[in-house]
UniProtKB/Swiss-Prot annotation:
Chain ranges of the POTRA domain: 34-102
Record note on quaternary structure: Part of a complex composed of FtsB, FtsL and FtsQ.
Ranges facing Periplasmic side: 29-240
Task of the protein: Essential cell division protein. May link together the upstream cell division proteins, which are predominantly cytoplasmic, with the downstream cell division proteins, which are predominantly periplasmic. May control correct divisome assembly.
Gene: ftsQ
Protein name stated in the entry: Cell division protein FtsQ
Recorded family membership: Belongs to the FtsQ/DivIB family. FtsQ subfamily.
PROSITE patterns in alphabetical order: POTRA
Native source species: Thioalkalivibrio sp. (strain K90mix)
């Protein structure tokens, strides 16, 4: 082949090479293949161990050449007090690690917290978090207890009772803890209609000013029993 045909073939070959080169360039991220010289932690974490985060990042891949950032991100998010991590490469050689801490919404047991997703994290000193509602039960039941807390809090607020905690025993019996120190025993059935009995009885219960309520037992089908502070030590109570 000579003349115009040869020139056309050569032109087509050159065009193909240019297209292939452009495609490779578009799919090639040079930053992923450059060594990282520095690490910057952002997000102003207050509780997460930034030294441990730095150590984990540095140990992940020597020189950080070709580091799989997704794998590293998952490892960092599994660390205590880390809810989410974003990794960004900053020109020319910086890896930015943006840390978002979990938002605690409740205490759990003796030394853990529950975040807004229902996940447990800790151990922590709960004295710093005593303003949060206290939940207790078997691990894995925290979402159920969170929902129960919201339900009973809303129902008892109608009578001026403040719920500060909910406990589920090993036999799935429920106890509600009030801000004044009183306990409300629910048994295995958290029936909001039974809570209505307490709401309706609240004015009469508050009319007695000589002793605070220690315990309210709602495990009766059609009534409740009240133990006052001086009677609680003897496990007594007045049925209504």
């Amino acid at each position: 082949m000579t003349g115009p045909g040869l020139r056309l073939l050569a032109g087509m070959g050159l065009a193909g090479a240019l297209v292939l080169g452009l495609s490779l360039w578009l799919h090639f991220d040079p930053d992923q293949h450059l060594p990282i010289g520095s690490i910057q932690i952002t997000g102003e974490p207050r509780h997460a161990d930034t030294d441990a985060i730095l150590e984990r990042v540095r140990a992940h891949a020597p020189g950080f050449v070709g580091t799989d950032l997704e794998v590293l991100r998952e490892e960092l998010q599994a660390m205590p007090w880390v809810d989410a991590v974003q990794l960004r490469r900053r020109w020319p050689d910086t890896l930015e690690v943006h840390v978002t801490e979990p938002v605690p919404v409740a205490q759990w047991g003796d030394d853990h917290l529950v975040d807004r997703h229902g996940r447990l994290f800790g151990p922590v000193d709960l004295a710093e978090w005593d303003f949060l509602p206290a939940l207790a039960g078997e691990d894995g039941r925290q979402v159920v207890l969170m929902h129960r807390y919201l339900e009973v809090s809303a129902r008892l607020a109608d009578a001026g009772f403040e719920v500060v905690g909910v406990h589920e025993g090993k036999r799935h019996d429920w106890t509600i803890h009030l801000a004044d120190g009183a306990e409300v025993l629910m048994g295995r059935d958290v029936n909001l209609n039974r809570l209505g009995q307490l709401v309706r009885a609240a004015p009469a219960l508050r009319a007695r000013e000589d002793a605070p309520i220690a315990r309210v037992d709602l495990r009766y089908p059609h009534g409740l029993a009240v133990a006052w502070a001086e009677e609680a030590d003897n496990d007594g109570g007045n049925a209504r």
